[in-house]
């Protein structure tokens, strides 16, 4: 980061939209918002945009919460309380609250910002960067802010190339040769292809940079239009594209990579399959996302636990793990793991076999269990002798099984078993 980028970051406030449920994760988000979902053995999803902001030199951050916010708020209080007001630093948790007009829910992404206008203006940032709180990536926001200032844009939109057939869940844009946005379509049924790349589309990452004064001005103008949906992708960005200057910022320009990361990494882990795959990808010999990057750390709350322990060394009862990540507080007692990722405090008991398992914290895998391609929710107690991943029809009756064969197991599902 050069001096100019550092100066711009100090003039910027980050506003993180962290109120979404993530309904395609099904029971995993019954008790927590999607940004509070676990990822990578010890982190939460929200730790990634927050770490990007801190590592980029941004020290004023607001986090808007709404759906099932307790788990998220508790995590932020425990893991992100190191900001010092005397150093002009703060992280404000901004739950939806009753306003003068008696409305108390955020009606959309733009409304979350509008309802906190007084707090934002109280800090007086010249620039504001709007961030989605539910994606996995490493990015230097200071570089994106510099691009915004140098281009003279009214808004700069972070963008990434995605397969066209997967782009209908994003805002999709058309750009000219200088990255000026010519059209912006929110969640199109038939996403337009990129010129020369018929199978690719240019999708919004849900990251926007504005001058703060301009943002509130354009929001007031949009709010006066009948049918206003209080949404950045549905209202604010298309309005600027039509009457102002909107510029696309390719993620490849500001993504953070180590020598071990071959391509820019950005994931929306919004389905059970995507969540399972992205976690297990971290166990690869050369993972696409390098969490061992000490130059760009992912800050989080770290529980005080003992180191992981592996015990027993008998034939058929050997505590072992291959191509796996095992977090602190875990005890692998006479069981075998292959390509697994275990969060804090998981216990696996003798003769159990785990292959392709992602386990949330403090789950217990009892003796003789065999689990293949499974996501285990926090605190689940797997009964002795349970077999999952070998009988698709039976798995589908008892658990949530995806089309690709990944099974999600929660405690209420276990409680219904006749064993």
Swiss-Prot record:
Catalyzed reaction equations: alpha-D-glucose 1-phosphate + ATP + H(+) = ADP-alpha-D-glucose + diphosphate
Keyword Glycosyltransferase attributed: no
UniProt KW rRNA-binding keyword: no
EC number: 2.7.7.27
Membrane-spanning segments: none
Keywords in alphabetical order: ATP-binding, Carbohydrate metabolism, Glycogen biosynthesis, Glycogen metabolism, Nucleotide-binding, Nucleotidyltransferase, Transferase
Similarity remark: Belongs to the bacterial/plant glucose-1-phosphate adenylyltransferase family.
Subunit structure: Homotetramer.
Name assigned to this protein: Glucose-1-phosphate adenylyltransferase
Native source organism of the sequence: Roseobacter denitrificans (strain ATCC 33942 / OCh 114) (Erythrobacter sp. (strain OCh 114))
Classification lineage: Bacteria, Pseudomonadati, Pseudomonadota, Alphaproteobacteria, Rhodobacterales
Gene that produces this protein: glgC
